[in-house]
Swiss-Prot record:
Pfam families: EamA. Translocates 4-amino-4-deoxy-L-arabinose-phosphoundecaprenol (alpha-L-Ara4N-phosphoundecaprenol) from the cytoplasmic to the periplasmic side of the inner membrane. Belongs to the ArnE family. Heterodimer of ArnE and ArnF. The gene is arnE. Residues 43-112 form the EamA domain. It is found in: Cell inner membrane. It comes from Yersinia enterocolitica serotype O:8 / biotype 1B (strain NCTC 13174 / 8081). InterPro entries: EamA_dom (IPR000620), Flippase_ArnE (IPR022883), Small_drug/metabolite_transptr (IPR000390). This is Probable 4-amino-4-deoxy-L-arabinose-phosphoundecaprenol flippase subunit ArnE. Gene3D superfamilies: 1.10.3730.20.
Amino acid sequence: MTSYLLLITVSLLTCAGQLCQKQAAQSWALPQHYRLAPTLRWLASAVVLLSLGMLLWLRLLQHLPLSVAYPILSFNFVLVTLAAQFFYGEQATSRHWLGIASIMFGILLISWHL
């Protein structure tokens, strides 16, 4: 059970790091004299979140085989897509959702015996 809590935490940290990177990219579009500070803050936040995720990932790999853990981490596709829709108003096509459903089905197949 601890392994799955770690995996969820890694997924959430990675997703949050991706959102911070998106925000940094948007901050870079601000006028030149306003963009440096917010861009650096968002980039620093991304580095911290992604670094924490990586450290927990290393811990997780002590408990789960890579061949099991890595495919399950693909749940990030769902998290990032939902977060992008919620925070940035991005739209996903039905083909996009079909691809995500295929990924989730694959995750189910891999984790069925765990």
